[in-house]
């Protein structure tokens, strides 16, 4: 995504790729909000969601009717809460360790525990 963002001013294909990524994310948020009957929180996580204020901004544009309104300064600073105060939907940025999660899931598969609740298994073995 960093490469696409850096190239989008001079490369229409890069600009289209970024625009489509954000559009599809907005579509998914809207679909989930419809199924859930609204939303009170939107969480950005992972590499792009955690580190790209530009992408968060572009995804959130057009979601104001769902109560999503970003605080530009908080978003740029990668604060834990990047929405304006008092809005209906709190927008959060949550740090993750994706590599650790992949490793844990891989270990569960290799140990034959795929699809089980790891915490429940850990409690039984304690």
Task: Locate predicted features.
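Internal helix-turn-beta structural module
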Residues: 13-35, 39-43, 49-115
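Short, charge-rich patches within N-terminal targeting peptides
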Residues: 121-124
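A mobile "lid/hinge" subdomain adjacent to the ATP/sugar-phosphate binding pocket shared
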Residues: 1-17
């Amino acid at each position: 995504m960093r490469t696409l963002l850096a190239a989008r001013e001079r490369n229409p294909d890069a600009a289209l790729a970024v625009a489509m990524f954000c559009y599809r994310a907005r579509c998914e948020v809207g679909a989930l909000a419809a199924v859930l009957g609204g939303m009170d929180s939107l969480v950005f996580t992972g590499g792009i969601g955690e580190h790209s204020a530009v992408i968060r901004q572009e995804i959130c544009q057009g979601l104001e009717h769902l109560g999503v309104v970003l605080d530009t300064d908080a978003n740029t600073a990668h604060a834990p809460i990047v929405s304006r105060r008092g809005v209906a939907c709190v927008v959060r940025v949550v740090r993750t360790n994706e590599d650790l999660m992949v490793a844990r899931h891989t270990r569960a598969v290799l140990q034959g525990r795929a699809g089980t609740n790891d915490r429940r298994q850990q409690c039984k073995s304690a």
